[in-house]
C-alpha cells in the first residue's frame, strides 16, 4: 500500500509566524525519501500552502506530487501550468477547519475541468463520500482515481476507542452508547470496503484519506482494493515528538501488507 504524506500542517505552522520556518521544501524532501507521494492542498484563501510551495516542490522533488484543490479557475490554471502528477478535486468552504465531506459530483464545471487536466497529462482523482452512487458518477465523469472520505469512520473510531468524548473536542452527534457506536463503526467499515470493491470493479484506482491516524489505520489497510492512503495531520502531529522521518516510517510500517 502506498502512502501519500500531506504536508499542509507544516505550512500551517510556518504561516503562524509568516517566516520560512519550518521550510516546506525541506519537509517535501523528507517525504520524497521516505514516503511514496507528496500531497499538498492549495486552498482558495491560501491559508497554509502557497503557489510558490507547489512550484518549488514540483521543480525540486522527484516524488509524485498530488495537488488537492477546489474547482477554482485560478488554482486549476496553476495546475495546468505546473503539471503535478495528480490533481485531487475536493470541496472547499472558507469557514471550515478541514475538508468536511466529499465533492459534489453534479457541479457544472466538473466534467470540463477533468477533461482539461487530463488533456494536460495530469491524472485526476475525485475526493468523494463513500457511496456507490458517487463511485458510479466518478466513472461516468472519466476520473482515473477516487479517494474515499474516511472522516466519519475516523470520528466513530475516536468516539469508541479514545477519550475524546470526555474532552472539548467531542462530537455531539456521536454522544451515544458504545453498542450503538460499535454497530455504526462496523457498518461504516463495511461500507468503505463495499465502495472500494465497486470502484475497482469499474476500473477506478481507489485511495482513502481524512482523519486516518496510527490507531485507526489498520482496519482500512485490510481493505485490499484500496491501493493508497493520504495522511497528513496525524503524521505531522507525531513528528513533533519523533521527527518527520520517523513519523513517516512508523506509518509506513503500519500500512505494510
From Swiss-Prot:
Enzymatic reactions: 3-amino-2-oxopropyl phosphate + 1-deoxy-D-xylulose 5-phosphate = pyridoxine 5'-phosphate + phosphate + 2 H2O + H(+)
Entry's localization field: Cytoplasm
Enzyme Commission code(s) on record: 2.6.99.2
Active site as annotated: 41, 68, 210
Binding site residues for 1-deoxy-D-xylulose 5-phosphate: 8-9, 43, 48, 98
Transferase recorded as keyword: yes
Pfam families in the record: PdxJ
Protein name: Pyridoxine 5'-phosphate synthase
Organism for this UniProt entry: Campylobacter jejuni subsp. jejuni serotype O:2 (strain ATCC 700819 / NCTC 11168)
Amino acid at each position: 500500500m502506498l502512502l501519500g504524506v500531506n504536508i499542509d500542517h507544516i505550512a500551517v505552522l510556518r504561516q503562524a509566524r509568516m517566516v520560512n520556518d519550518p521550510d516546506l521544501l525541506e519537509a517535501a524532501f523528507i517525504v520524497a525519501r521516505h514516503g511514496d507521494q507528496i500531497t499538498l492542498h492549495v486552498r482558495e484563501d491560501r491559508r497554509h500552502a502557497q503557489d510558490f510551495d507547489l512550484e518549488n516542490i514540483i521543480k525540486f522533488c522527484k516524488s509524485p506530487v498530488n495537488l488537492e484543490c477546489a474547482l477554482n479557475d485560478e488554482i486549476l490554471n496553476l495546475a495546468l501550468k505546473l503539471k503535478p502528477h495528480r490533481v485531487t478535486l475536493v470541496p472547499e468552504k472558507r469557514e471550515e477547519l478541514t475538508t468536511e465531506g466529499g465533492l459534489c459530483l453534479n457541479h457544472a464545471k466538473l466534467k470540463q475541468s477533468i477533461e482539461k487536466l487530463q488533456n494536460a497529462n495530469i491524472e485526476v482523482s475525485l475526493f468523494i463520500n463513500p457511496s456507490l452512487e458517487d463511485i458510479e458518477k466518478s466513472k461516468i465523469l472519466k476520473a482515473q482515481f477516487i479517494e474515499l472520505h474516511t472522516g466519519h469512520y475516523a470520528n466513530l473510531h475516536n468516539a469508541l476507542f479514545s477519550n475524546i468524548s470526555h474532552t472539548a473536542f467531542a462530537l455531539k452527534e456521536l454522544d451515544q452508547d458504545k453498542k450503538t457506536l460499535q454497530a455504526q463503526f462496523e457498518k461504516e467499515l463495511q461500507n468503505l470496503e463495499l465502495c472500494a470493491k465497486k470502484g475497482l470493479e469499474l476500473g477506478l484506482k481507489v485511495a482513502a484519506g481524512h482523519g486516518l491516524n496510527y490507531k485507526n489505520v489498520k482496519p482500512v489497510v485490510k481493505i485490499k482494493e484500496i491501493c493508497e492512503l493520504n495522511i497528513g495531520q496525524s503524521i505531522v502531529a507525531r513528528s513533533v515528538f519523533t521527527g518527520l522521518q520517523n513519523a513517516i516510517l512508523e506509518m509506513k510500517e503500519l500500512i505494510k501488507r
